[in-house]
C-alpha cells in the first residue's frame, strides 16, 4: 500500500484524495502518474521525519519524472532532507540542481543563504574572520536573490542585509526609493 494511503492526518488525506482525482482527470501518462505517486509518498514520509523512506521515494520519482520543473521540486525536497540531516554540502548540491531546472525557487536561495550564514558563524568560532566574511557575503548574495523573487518574504534576511551593510544599492527597493525622492 502506498504511504499516502496510510496517512492519519486530515490535511494529508484531503491532499491525497484531491491529488488522486486530479491525476485521474488530467491527461497524464502512466509514467507521470507513477512519478507523482512516488513524489507524494516522499512528501508524506518527509513530513513525518522518515527521511530515509522519503529519499527512496524521491529517487524513484527522479528516475521517472522527465519534466524539468517538476524535477526541480523533487531536487529541492532532497536538499531539504540533507539540510535537516546536517549534510550541508550535499544539500547545496541539490539546491543548485533544483535552481538549474527552475530559477524561480526563492526558498532554495533562502536555504542556501542559511547554510552559508551558518558556515560563516562556524568560521568565526574557529577564529577565521576572513573565511567568515566570504561565507557571509555568499549568504547575502543568495538572500538578495530570494528577496528579489519574493519581496514580501524573508524579513529577517532583509534586516540582516541592512544591518550588515550587505543590502546592495542596486537592489530594487533601493532603486525604487531613490527614484521616488523629491529633488
UniProtKB/Swiss-Prot annotation:
Protein's GO biological process: photosynthesis
Claim: Chloroplast is one of the keywords in the record: yes
Signal peptide start-end: none
Each TPR repeat, start to end: 35-68, 72-105, 120-153
Keywords for the protein's UniProt record, in alphabetical order: Chloroplast, Membrane, Photosynthesis, Plastid, Repeat, Thylakoid, TPR repeat
Protein's UniProt keywords contain Repeat: yes
Subcellular location as annotated: Plastid, Chloroplast thylakoid membrane
UniProt topology in membrane: Peripheral membrane protein
Similarity comment: family membership: Belongs to the Ycf3 family.
Stated name of the protein: Photosystem I assembly protein Ycf3
Organism: Adiantum capillus-veneris (Maidenhair fern)
Amino acid at each position: 500500500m502506498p504511504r499516502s494511503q496510510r496517512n492519519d492526518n486530515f490535511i494529508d488525506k484531503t491532499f491525497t484524495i484531491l491529488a488522486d482525482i486530479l491525476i485521474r482527470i488530467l491527461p497524464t501518462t502512466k509514467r507521470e502518474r507513477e512519478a507523482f505517486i512516488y513524489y507524494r509518498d516522499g512528501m508524506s514520509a518527509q513530513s513525518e521525519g522518515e527521511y530515509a523512506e522519503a529519499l527512496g521515494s524521491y529517487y524513484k520519482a527522479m528516475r521517472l519524472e522527465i519534466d524539468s520543473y517538476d524535477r526541480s521540486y523533487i531536487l529541492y525536497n532532497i536538499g531539504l532532507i540533507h539540510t535537516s540531516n546536517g549534510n550541508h554540502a550535499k544539500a547545496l548540491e541539490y539546491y543548485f540542481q533544483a535552481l538549474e531546472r527552475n530559477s524561480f525557487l526563492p526558498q532554495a536561495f533562502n536555504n542556501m543563504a542559511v547554510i552559508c550564514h551558518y558556515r560563516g558563524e562556524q568560521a568565526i568560532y574557529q577564529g577565521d574572520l576572513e573565511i567568515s566574511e566570504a561565507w557571509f557575503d555568499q549568504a547575502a548574495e543568495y538572500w538578495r536573490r530570494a528577496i528579489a523573487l519574493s519581496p514580501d518574504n524573508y524579513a529577517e534576511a532583509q534586516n540582516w542585509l541592512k544591518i550588515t551593510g550587505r543590502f546592495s544599492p542596486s537592489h530594487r527597493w533601493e532603486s525604487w526609493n531613490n527614484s521616488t525622492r523629491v529633488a
